[in-house]
Amino acid sequence: MAKLIVNADDFGYSEGVNHGIISAHKNGIVTSCTVMANMPGFEHGMALIKENPTLRCGVHMTLTCYKPLLKDHKTIVDENGNFFRRPSEEVLKNIDLEEVYREFKAQIEKVRERVEITHLDSHHHVHGEEYLRPVIERIANEYKLPMRQSSEMAIDGVTYAKCLGNFYMNNVKEE
């Protein structure tokens, strides 16, 4: 078993991100990635995964970037059909958790059709948000995959990979 996992998230975001992650993997830095199934670079990323079978692949469940895979959502998208980048308190109060579940499941299944999934995490660490706990518990129990721990929230029966969250929180700045 690996003693250190270096995971690169946002795989599938764009061709540039994909090439950067593949380069880091080929140079012995990155050992796994998590894929954004809803992003424009997804197909490109899947082609690169086939060429690099030693790169383990998880799903980077996405609820705050670009567009959902499913088009019938009402509460998790704006008037243009895009995910809310930073949902307001009003939006959060009215989210239909069934929509979130169906979207996360669609993302997982899209990746699973192409590659063996090794683990789960999420864009902007939304899987650690308490309001999504019922959805994350349901996904965790259904798929039985290890999950990156992003908060103190723990779900019975889920294996967590601890991460250096302080590095992210203290060093990554969003504009």
Residue ranges of model-derived segments:
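Acidic (Asp/Glu)-rich catalytic clusters
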Residues: 21-27, 45-56, 74-78, 112-113
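Histidine-centered catalytic micro-motifs
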Residues: 6-12, 61, 119-129
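Boundary/entry segment of secreted carbohydrate-active catalytic domains
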Residues: 1-15, 21
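Structural preference for beta-strand elements that scaffold enzyme active sites
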Residues: 3-5, 30-34, 54-60, 117-121, ...
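A short alpha/beta connector and helix-capping loop motif
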Residues: 15-40
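Active-site gating loops and adjacent loop-to-helix segments of metal-dependent hydrolytic enzymes
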Residues: 67-95
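Short, structured active-site "lid" loops
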Residues: 50-68
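Catalytic domains of cell-wall/extracellular-matrix polysaccharide-remodeling enzymes
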Residues: 105-174
